Amino acid sequence: MVVTHGTDTLAESAFFIDVTVNSPKPVVFVGAMRPATAISADGPMNLLNAVTLAASKDAMNRGTLIALNDRFGSAFYTIKTNSTTVDTFKAEEQGFLGTFTSAKPYFWFSPATPVGKVTFDVSNVTSLPKVVILYAYQDQDAALIDAAIKDGAKGIVIDGSGNGSINSAVKKRIAELDKQGFPVVRATRTNSGLVTAKTEGIGAGVYSASKSRWLLSLALSTGLSYDQIKSMFGG
């Protein structure tokens, strides 16, 4: 299957499909960074490559893939790294799964499953619990956290600095929520690196804030406990 998608949220949608579709068949997301009217539009070649990739038997058992700019990678790790350039989609540390040569996919590795990957069955899910993303900054207080909860959020993702860092006021409020079993996941706004286990809140591990949001919402929809959610993220 090939899914054409706007590039701004392509990585988020592809990740959602990756953790909800449990099938050996490939799902390939593709988009374009340049409009069709550009002198060197990238859309037509990207689409041809994506269709060729989806039809390849070597693409089986690799989960959801993202294909742009003559390269393809796992939706589990790939993110958008630049607002305008055609080589924007990358997995900074994990790397690409392969490239295209004369519109034919060439794989660098045999099929493998990302460490820690979980798949959710959403066949009977009609709506997902509300999870919001809050941006961490200096001198931040807990007001937005409380406002999000009052507005119906069942979980929160903090897009923190560095290793999911937050200030003392926010950390104190998260510690209180920990005791209530309310999940707050601490991600990082850097483009690479893990967020390690936390005393206050849940470290996001390898997941970006947007991917953490999907994962937390899916976990809540299946009734996972706070401890199970923490274990799923790795901390």
Question: Where does each model-flagged region fall?
Answer:
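Short, acidic/small-residue loops that bind anionic groups at enzyme active sites
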Residues: 14-45, 51-55, 179-188
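Short Gly/Thr/Asp-enriched flexible loops that form oxyanion-binding sites at enzyme active sites
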Residues: 3-25, 166-175
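Short, ordered loop/turn segments at secondary-structure junctions
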Residues: 6-7, 32-35, 161-163, 188-193
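Short acidic, glycine-rich surface-loop motifs adjacent to enzyme active sites
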Residues: 1-10, 151-163
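C-terminal non-catalytic interaction/assembly regions of soluble proteins
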Residues: 163-235
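Internal gly/pro-rich beta-alpha loop/helix module
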Residues: 30-101
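Accessory alpha-helical/coil subdomains and C-terminal extensions
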Residues: 74-155, 163
